Amino acid sequence: MNSREMFCVFILFASFFYCSYAEQECNCDKSCEPVKDCTFGTAMDKCGCCEVCAVGIGHFCGKFFNNAVCAEGLKCAKLGEGADGEALEICLRA
């Protein structure tokens, strides 16, 4: 499978998750679960309440994928738009 075909499969897979996305509200009660074994380190969640495992380059981030936060040195960048016009975002070098 060439890189273009892999990219198309990637977008198709991402669309499946995007359709099942439900945006989370910020309810900062500070009763956070401890994080461990984070491949890309840790970061504060989108509300600034709890430490969470960060995601790495090429991973989905932002509200598209459970409000995932990019690792240090990366930024959550717009990749395109889903069917409902919401932005698809992935972690890229800052």
Curated annotation (Swiss-Prot):
Disulfide bonds join 19-47, 26-49, 32-50, 38-53, 61-76, 70-91. PROSITE patterns: IGFBP_N_2. Residues 23-94 form the IGFBP N-terminal domain. Expressed by the venom gland. The keyword Transcription regulation does not apply. Its main location: secreted. GO terms for cellular component: extracellular region. It is found in: Secreted. Keywords: Disulfide bond, Secreted, Signal. Residues 1-22 form the signal peptide. This is Venom protein 59.1.
